[in-house]
Amino acid sequence: MNKQIKNIVIVGGGTAGWTTALNFLQKTIKPKITVIASKEIPIIGVGESTTGRFNDLIQFKNNNINIDEKDFLLKTGSTFKIGILHTNWHTIGESFTSPLGDNFINEKNYPHKGYDYFRIYHISKNLKFDTMIQSQLMLNNKLPFFEVNEDFPEINEFNLKNAKLDFRFNHIAYHLDTFKTGQYLKEKVIENKRVKYIDDTVVDVKKNNDETLRYLILKSGKKISGDFFIDCSGFQRLLIEKQFKNNFISYENELLVNRAMPFHIENKKNTVINNYTHVIAKKYGWMWDIPLQHRKGCGYVYCDNYITPEKAQEEIEKDLKIKITPQKDIKFKAGRLQKFWCKNVLSTGLSSAFVEPLEATSIHMTVMQINHFLEQYYSDNINFNCENLIEQYNNEMTSVWDDIKDFIVLHYNSPRKDTLFWKEASSEKRRSQRLKKLLNIWENRMPREVDYQGNLSNSFYYFGNTLWYQILIGMKILKKEVATKELKSFDLLEHTKKMFDFRKKYTKLMVKKCFLNNDFYKNELKNLEKYSKVILK
């Protein structure tokens, strides 16, 4: 029997809770939304970077809710993210870029959709993947904005003069201050008349005879009824795990790190605001460095089987040559729930799964899971007892999360053996049977989109060929001779060489014109609405 969805109840605030509320406001028109989030419960977020999918939330426009991108950036101190710079992962002292998105120059898919002959060419020539415009912007501390003040036919296909151009398309993302972003989104969401915010804590629930949730009992004694509940309560998993027979599937046999030590570094007058997340492999894990307009959000993710929190702090302070003040000590378990949707309860964010924050997986999947649900499963009437419907969604999310877990494990496919942690993390036994199978396939042919489990038929998956290739290239896993043979078999070697030479020249011209990161934030961000968005071909 179908249930009409009139009231949606979201348990938990933070990035997960408020982005979920924002998604429902943007893409539904009828149901009322109640958000229950206690100010007494601290936000777990430690500074985040996003993928391009978060852009849709900030840039989405309709009559329900509007967010102005410039206003968001100015008030939260967020910055643009063009990619990730990996240091010390393959060899100590060596770095490689992992830019977001495809090249700004559009190419035809040949011999079939998803065949990335440009990246394959880099493998065939043993080249670092730094030819893309995004990579060069990263390495030169520039952003994809420029002014056309003179004739510039090499890039000015529209023959514009005295124009401000924004050629981001959807190839960049954001670096966020978790607390400021959560507060900003909260303010925007509760402005809407469909939303009711309750500062309280869930202590119990009441179920219907069919095991669906009927209402929540709050610490204050209030009873909050709902037709559909979304668990954004983080690692507590108040609804999705505690109210249903729902097992947690651990990834600890494949991913070793289990602790995080976040800290901040305030910007100085001469601090360069990078346009990339820097992830630096350390002795017993890795460190993130997320640049904001006012500070850096940093942290050491490590395995406490090999180092204590005190020694971890000493290692970071020695490497950075400064004293740090850890914001908190976060102990976590990598893994996912067996079921992401149970009856009339859906989970997202940390409530559903978590892996180490190496590729902006957490906030991406928060957005992706809700978007996929809204696109493929949501209606005003849902049968919460239709096991096949719910099972299909759960199978899809299981597939995606297991795919992401294998992608993270791939980062540890390293020749490093300098500590016990790296000897263990890089050992073959840490790879799933599926990842071993893929690596064997890629010894004989280059990767294809069909290789990834999470290839859902929508635009939100993201962790596909592009990202896998960049890690495979950076970690020097793919074979030069296989790449060369394949390009020759499709008669693409010479064609790609010409394209490679053209792109090098084109990229050099583009990067020369673009604003330096710091200059843009200081002088141009306030004029963001004056920039015309263009897609350069």
Where are these regions (language model features)?
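N-terminal Rossmann-like FAD-binding beta1-loop-alpha1 element of flavoenzymes
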Residues: 6-31
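Glycine-rich FAD pyrophosphate-binding loop
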Residues: 25-46
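Dinucleotide-binding Rossmann-like beta1-alpha1 core, especially the glycine-rich loop
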Residues: 46-148
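Predominantly flavin-linked oxidoreductase catalytic cores and closely associated redox partners
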Residues: 163-312, 370
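Conserved FAD/dinucleotide-binding core of flavoprotein oxidoreductases
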Residues: 281-333, 353-364, 379-382, 386
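Short FAD-binding loop at a beta-strand-to-alpha-helix junction that anchors the flavin cofactor
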Residues: 340-358
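Long, low-complexity C-terminal extensions of enzymes
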Residues: 376-537
